[in-house]
Every structure is written in C-alpha cells, then in structure tokens.
Design a protein with these regions (language model features):
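Short solvent-exposed loop/turn micro-motifs enriched in small/polar/acidic residues
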Residues: 2-4, 170-171
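Short, glycine-anchored, charge-dense loop/turn motifs used at functional sites
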Residues: 3, 7-20, 163, 179-188
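Carboxylate/His-rich catalytic cores and anion/metal-binding grooves
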Residues: 109-128, 170-190
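Residue-level structural signal for beta-strand termini and adjacent loop
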Residues: 21-24, 192, 262
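Short, solvent-exposed alpha-helical surface patches in non-cytosolic proteins
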Residues: 89-91, 185, 227-228
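Small/polar-residue-rich segments within soluble enzyme cores
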Residues: 16-148
Length: 294
C-alpha cells in the first residue's frame, strides 16, 4: 500500500526546509467489520467513501487518524505533509494538483526536478486467506529513494514570516517584497490575502482573488514612472526649466488622462511637475520623447 510518493523539498537561503516539515499519522486498516466499526467515525468525512470501498474490496488501506483513534489502530505510520499548518510563502511556493504535480509557483516551475527527487514509501503487509493480517509477519515500510533533488530559494524564512505577520495585520489586499539591495536577491515575497495550499478549493469559493500573486502581477506603473521620464528628458537635453500649461486633462488616442481630482496645475516646470505629480506634464513629455528613447 502506497504511504507517500514523496517529492523533493523547497528550501530557503539558509537551507531550512519550507515544505515537508510536518507529518500526520496514518492507520493501516485491516479489511473486516472490526476495523470498520472501530475506526469509521474517526475517518475524515471526505475519505469515508474511499474507506468503505476498500473494506468492501477486502483490501488494506491507509487512512489519517488522530488522538484516540490512532491509539486504537493496530499499525500506524508517519506520512510527511507537504505544507505546514501555517503555510509560508504559499504564493511563491505554489501548490500541487490532485495528481501530485505542481500547479503554480516553484512547485510548477521546477516540477520535473522536484518529482525526480521524490522517495516512494510503501507499506508491505502479508495477508491470510481470510483477508486479515498475519500476526507473525508485521507490516513494514519499504522506501525507493529518488534523486533527493530539491530547490533552494533566495528567500529568508525569518524575514518572510515577519513580513507575513505585518501583512496579515495591516493589509487586506496587496503585497510586500523585500530585496537585498547589493545583490537584488528576493528575501521575502508576500501576497495578500493568503490562501491554504492544502485546501485550494476553499480559497476559490471565497472569491477574494487570494490565489493571485500580487507580488508578481502586472500593474500600471503610475507615478513611480515620472522620475524615469524626467531623467530621460534631461539626457535628451530638454531643460528642466521648460514650462508646460496644465489644464487638468490631456487627450491621447481618444482617451482622456486627468490629473488628480481633475484640477489643472497651471504653469509647471519639471521640478514643480514632480512635486505636484502632474500627470499631464509627464504624458506630454513621454509623447515628445517617444517609447524608443524612454
């Protein structure tokens, strides 16, 4: 009986694992009414049909159990859980589909490598003619190691956790990104709201777009592009003292772009336009420069 097909782990920059750090207990269920009556109520509701079908076939199966139910089971085994109860960097790491392959994030981008790094773990057991376990031959684990390959990120888990804590408290929808200035390496990447990679369906049902990675999504650059336009203009010999009359709106290609609140700034030069974030000044400046120059 397959316990775990495993998967290569994902690590932070200090080689601390971000996946596969926790486990849950699985009971090896022996076919027969004793197992059915003893453990059925302890089996998660979504797995009971599978549990019952296995019992009906007379086949042993593995089911997650906790607490007293685990104590009642004759044989239990630890199975690694891919994601922590409090997941970390879930938008960056991504999640797995029902097939066990990556659907998004690093899980998807490096799926071949992570799948090749997996270790197949099986529970071997010997059955008698009546479909029960042979007591003198206890079930045991057999592992078929993979390459052991994993993926190391530039992420720092301590910085990531700190950013997630701040984001949960302060941000409804948005993102937090921390970069190492000298190297450009990403140390944290948080997108909010968060989602549970072990229960993606619940996030889809919430309809809060929590599956969107806002840290990597495309946005209109807005006013942060204005200093770049100013620098390009100066490089092209356009004087910073040259003035422009802002009326509060400017039309380009049939679309009207407006300044904040639709009010004009009057006569502005480059310095004043930057200070007051004049949209019209920089739209006309961008048109003068052209895309290739910028």
């Amino acid at each position: 009986v397959v316990l775990s097909e495993g998967r290569g782990n994902i690590y932070d920059c200090g080689f601390l694992p971000l996946t596969g750090t926790v486990s849950e207990r699985y009971a090896l269920i022996e076919p027969g009414r004793t197992s059915y009556h003893t453990l059925f109520e302890a089996i998660p509701a979504e797995l009971r049909t599978q549990f019952y079908a296995s019992i009906q076939r007379g086949s042993p199966c593995l089911m997650p159990v906790t607490g007293a139910a685990a104590a009642r089971a004759q044989y239990t085994f630890e199975k690694p859980v891919r994601y922590q109860p409090m997941p970390i960097a879930q938008h960056l790491i991504g999640y797995l589909g029902a097939s066990g392959h990556g659907v998004s994030g690093v899980e998807y981008a490096f799926d071949d490598l992570l799948t090749g790094g997996s270790t197949l773990t099986e529970v071997r057991c010997t059955m008698n003619a009546r479909g029960g376990f042979i007591e003198s031959d206890a079930p045991y684990l057999v592992e078929s190691p993979g390459t052991g390959a994993g993926v190391m990120l530039t992420l720092d888990s301590s910085i990531q956790r700190a950013c997630e804590a701040v984001g949960i408290e302060m941000v409804d929808k948005g993102c937090i990104v921390v970069l190492d200035a000298p190297t450009g390496r990403g140390r944290a990447s948080v997108s909010l709201p968060l989602y549970d990679p072990e229960n993606v369906a619940a996030s889809i049902a919430r309809q809060d777009t929590s599956l969107v990675n806002r840290a990597l999504s495309a946005y209109n650059v807005g006013s942060v592009f204005k200093p770049l336009l100013a620098a390009a203009a100066l490089e092209q010999g356009i004087s910073a003292q040259e003035t422009y009359e802002c009326t509060g709106s400017i039309e380009v290609g049939g679309h009207v772009y407006r300044c904040a609140y639709g009010r004009g700034h009057g006569t502005v030069d480059m310095k004043t336009a930057l200070e007051q974030s004049c949209n019209c000044y920089f739209v006309q400046l961008g048109l003068r420069l052209g895309a290739q120059t910028v």
